[in-house]
Amino acid sequence: MSNTVSLQFPDGSVREYDASMTGAALAESISKSLAKKAVAYAVDGTVRDLSDPLGASGKVEIITREDPRALELIRHDTAHVLAEAVQELFPGTQVTIGPVIENGFYYDFARNEPFTLDDLPVIEKKMREIIQRNKPFTKEVWSREKAKQVFSDKGESYKVELVDAIPAGQDLKIYYQGDWFDLCRGPHMASTGQIGNSFKLMKVAGAYWRGDANNPMLTRIYGTAFANDNDLQAYLHMLEEAEKRDHRRLGREMDLFHFQEEGPGVVFWHAKGWKMFQNLVSYMRRRLDSHGYQEVNTPQVLDKSLWETSGHWGWYRDNMFKVTVAGDDTDDDRVFALKPMNCPGHVQIFKHGLKSYRDLPIKLAEFGNVHRYEPSGALHGLMRVRGFTQDDAHIFCTEEQMAAECLQINDHILSVYKDFGFEEITIKLSTRPEKRVGSDELWDRAESVMMTVLEQIRQQSNNIKTGILPGEGAFYGPKFEYTLKDAIGREWQCGTTQVDFNLPERFGAFYIGADSEKKQPVMIHRAICGSMERFLGILIENFAGHMPLWFAPVQVVVATITSDADEYAKEAAAKLKAAGLQVVTDLRNEKINYKVREHSLQKVPVILVCGKREAEEKTVNMRRLGSRDQESMTLDEAIARLCEEATPPDLLRLKNAG
């Protein structure tokens, strides 16, 4: 076996090195300044400790703090420092697990007295002391038996349980930072000093061991960490903004919806919230019509035999709501379920009646109510519910039509997002997973088509980011995932386009080809909003409740200064309603500033104030949400202007095109 390895660098150059050379020595051989900046290195994309030997040939990269991959290392190391700090400050506390998560990390601790928010500043101070010590991260490999004995002697029963779950004979990695150590897969940076001080402990929460309510309750401490203070402060500012924009709070203030214990995870829509929901449905329905979809509706409750055929009963049953039928002897032994997805029902509609290749593509769409079980701890306002509405569509087409259909779907999705003000979109192609149906040849063709489509999208749209997610496709076919960025920089995955070879085959769906033979159609699953409830939650937070005039549930309030203007206010409101605007009249015997403030809190876009002078002159005083400016104009002028502004963007395009 050769003792040298061949390494290819990012600039394309290739050099030979001794296989036993470490990543740190490699960085040193390139330049001393790079060695000082290095926190890890990667070979063929796999991140390693700087202390690891090169071992094998491949593409090599030295990772510094500026590299996006360093962020996970920083957070991982900070979690370890958190655990050490807690055990220094609170002897007898057991450590359990502490993974990196989106935007930060957490660590779960077992302690008789749970931690509180008051403990966090003290723990943070100790963490900074540990980082200042700049102790190296060093790795040892232990046998399973040694690890179990050492953790048992330390009284770390949770670590013993983790070790027990590891297959016999498998060695374990133990990482030290000074004298403190933990069971960990790694990798880590070179020392605690490389973490820096750009971190913050955020909150505490209860968490059951292994997520099982039958197990002990632990205390989870959440934190975040960044490569520099600017990024940390930007993140903390974003959290402050997110709290102000929380759709659950705005939902209460704007009187849109509520949740209650008797219906966990399902929405009680109030009148204004339901109007907003219907505005979304109406807009999406018009967009469906303009893209050649046929709107259908499928049953809420279906026999389990259909779900067995579709495969849902086998792999999704635990997330489905089962229904027992009472009062009918013929149905006593049948098991039904609320549909978690609309796709099997759409296949049934496609199968109803003979289809020819001349009929394709057939586009079926549904605003389908679906139900999926989510643990109570995972429920989160409109963002995570148990009952919701999908803007679901399925295109049945030939393999040759697949590329054109995916491009049309992409145009449709992007134009919808643009109408709601989302300009920064990322599209990622998820490719074949290890467990999948269909031949490699079929996957090759499908992925080739979607790669071509992705490249066309990239060329046509300069502001669209694209990427590949290897192995993240559905088991039945590759898919596009659409992620949009909101007003405060958060990303939301919403739309999907998924190619499906599986479901048509399971249900025996076919069409008659040009050769008069039966052919299996390609089925493309398409969603734009995904969950319409969740999309509304995203919109509420993106606009901070200040919805565009065309989408607002109440567009105009006509408010009086004195009772002398009551009749004129009623007349003005009637004309505004006749013009198609959503109007509320406020004739209460309250001061006008009180009325304006109250309606502003409810995020009404426009308030038309009427006093005695306005009544005499047939004018209104217009005030807009978020502005102190006031503008006086005739009622007819106000109606004309507001009607123009309240025209939905799709209808405005039609009007301008005509």
UniProtKB/Swiss-Prot annotation:
Residues binding Zn(2+): 343, 394, 525
Record-annotated TGS domain positions: 1-64
Biological processes per GO annotation: threonyl-tRNA aminoacylation
Chief place of localization: cytoplasm
TM stretches of this protein: none
Annotated InterPro entries: aa-tRNA-synt_IIb, aa-tRNA-synth_II, aa-tRNA-synth_II/BPL/LPL, Anticodon-bd, Anticodon-bd_dom_sf, Beta-grasp_dom_sf, TGS, TGS-like
EC main group: ligase
Domain of life: Bacteria
Keywords of the record: Aminoacyl-tRNA synthetase, ATP-binding, Cytoplasm, Ligase, Metal-binding, Nucleotide-binding, Protein biosynthesis, RNA-binding, tRNA-binding, Zinc
Any one GO CC term of the record: cytosol
Catalyzed reactions per annotation: tRNA(Thr) + L-threonine + ATP = L-threonyl-tRNA(Thr) + AMP + diphosphate + H(+)
Family per record: Belongs to the class-II aminoacyl-tRNA synthetase family.
Function: Catalyzes the attachment of threonine to tRNA(Thr) in a two-step reaction: L-threonine is first activated by ATP to form Thr-AMP and then transferred to the acceptor end of tRNA(Thr). Also edits incorrectly charged L-seryl-tRNA(Thr).
Subunit structure as annotated in this protein's UniProt entry: Homodimer.
Stated name of the protein: Threonine--tRNA ligase
Primary gene name: thrS
